[in-house]
């Protein structure tokens, strides 16, 4: 299967983190570090639970037993491999 961005996953999709990347040269290195500290690390399974109103922000993402509400910009930094 092909990798995609977490921000592009449909609701309910299971996936595995492949990498945390800067989507542009404007990305804040502190943001990438924070995502790694939260558990978005290579090989970690996750599930995109649902999106906010209108299919936008926040994105509810489950890693292990931890639930995170991510902004679209944050989700665009996470490459995943859908299950």
Sequence positions of predicted segments:
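Compact, charge-rich alpha-helical regulatory domains located at protein termini
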Residues: 1-36, 41, 47-49, 57-83
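Small/polar glycine-rich anion-binding or flexible loop at a beta-alpha turn
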Residues: 52
């Amino acid at each position: 299967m092909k990798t995609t961005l977490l921000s592009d996953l449909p609701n309910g999709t299971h996936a595995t983190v492949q990498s945390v990347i800067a989507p542009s040269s404007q990305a804040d290195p502190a943001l990438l570090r924070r995502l790694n500290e939260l558990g978005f690390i290579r090989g970690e399974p996750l599930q995109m639970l649902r999106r906010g109103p209108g299919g936008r922000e926040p994105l509810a993402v489950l890693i292990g037993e931890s639930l995170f509400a991510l902004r679209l910009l944050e989700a665009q930094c996470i490459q995943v491999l859908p299950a």
